[in-house]
Amino acid sequence: MPSVIENDNNILTVKISGDIDHHASKELRLEIDREIMHARPKQVIFDLTECEFMDSSGLGLILGRMRKSSECGCDFKLVNPGAKTMRILRMAGVEKLIKIESVDL
């Protein structure tokens, strides 16, 4: 799961490409947490435009970063999930907990 983490104008954007699974979740989780704690952004955005697959580890990654963001006082949202990813998010009830948008970044 290649990913890019950008901090621009106090907005931390995590761009996920490929799969969010147990193989890559731990390393990415640590990297994102470090950035949230260091930068203290006003908003964290997970850009799922290029996310092709997500398992329960991916859901855990997202929900954990939502909680970490909340603890630091910053907003959290997901943008541009594809149909397969959105189906998993809906099945897990994530759309009731996290703002999900379709936008052009």
In which residue ranges do the predicted regions lie?
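STAS-like cytosolic regulatory interaction modules
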Residues: M1-E52, R67-L105
